[in-house]
Amino acid sequence: MKLSDAEIEKLRQSGIRLDGEGRFWHEGAEVTHHGLRAALWRWLDRNPDGRWVLRLDDQRFVWLDVDGDVPYVVRSARWEGDRAILRLADDSEEPLAVETLHLRGAQPFCRVKQGRFDARVSTLAWHTLAERIDDGKLCGFVIPTR
């Protein structure tokens, strides 16, 4: 049996939302199962039309509502020598790509996951990074406003 385009579109309405703090919700309840949360982060992608999806492959995906249109949050940061190490909402860690750090108004953002995604930098993480800001620069890079 082949599904119509309308039936497929209806099935893609997942009811899953990613909030501004990096928490997944389904039909009003927070997703708390560690394994399921990890899978949802692995499947996170963006369609060419700009809509957020949870993708298994080119044909199998569902729509994802993302609050604020930025999926990742930098929850904390620490310094290892001259490198800032970020802890993201998916519990992964990666070095800050300093050249991607920018401000939108007063809110700091950077690129994560090899530059694939924007991430909002939390207040806690920003305070750690700000310890090394000198004359509007972090590690020699000017922090632009966009």
Predicted feature locations:
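Terminal leader/tail segments of proteins
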Residues: 1-146
